[in-house]
Amino acid sequence: MEMLEEHRCFQGWQQRWRHDSSTLNCPMTFSIFLPPPRDHTPPPVLYWLSGLTCNDENFTTKAGAQRVAAELGIVLVMPDTSPRGEKVANGDGYDLGQSAGFYLNATQPPWATHYRMYDYLRDELPALVQSQFNVSDRCAISGHSMGGHGALIMALKNPGKYTSVSAFAPIVNPCSVPWGIKAFSRYLGEDKNAWLEWDRCALMYASNAQDAIPTLIDQGDNDQFLADQLQPAVLAEAARQKAWPMTLRIQPGYDHSYYFIASFIEDHLRFHAQYLLK
């Protein structure tokens, strides 16, 4: 690993690292916030997944999460949103290819060679964090928009791995909205049955009650993507039918931006702390 940046922050450290990923077949960067040590107990980790057009730095520089993470003693890990590089396939817009990995394992050429963000997040990155930093094995996950989709499917597909999950304005039903249809048809092919493996609503309907974990979702009612791309009511109905412990908060006047995330990130960190710090 190579350290790219390090900054003192709320008595902890904000760092950025590069490493060679064997899963994605390219170099990858991630950012990490290490809170000030309290005792000899390794701190838990919150993974944050960002949305379309983002990289590992958006949350780090815009969300203002470090102050509360330092207070609570929670490590923040921010991976990139896709594989990157000259040899990595790219798309024809902001919503496909680099910066738009959708946190799945692509099966179609030319994407399958590099676009295995699900495996990277499930296996390689946590193992790297565990080996290189003093952290516990307790972790939670959160994200925004495409990253909210990623956080929710990571939690559903890996029962017992995360203590809790949260999201801001997540894509919850990608099989049925333009962003998801475009990405899934390219990454996964035209067989829509294969898409269901990466759709939060489909996964929730197929889930077992004993695998449910506490879930918090915030959605702004002035979000320009609310009706066409996000549709949280569809997930709320799935959660109701499955008795999933989910809180959906509609926040008046808020849009899709990091101003929205910055306004409520403290709530999400304190929500996760209830379960991470047990």
Curated annotation (Swiss-Prot):
Keyword Hydrolase among record annotations: yes
Family: Belongs to the esterase D family.
Swiss-Prot/TrEMBL GO biological process terms: formaldehyde catabolic process
The species this protein was found in: Shigella dysenteriae serotype 1 (strain Sd197)
Reaction(s) catalysed by this chain's protein: S-formylglutathione + H2O = formate + glutathione + H(+)
NCBIfam families to which the protein is assigned, alphabetical: fghA_ester_D (TIGR02821)
Protein name, per record: S-formylglutathione hydrolase YeiG
Gene responsible for this protein: yeiG
Active site: S145, D223, H256
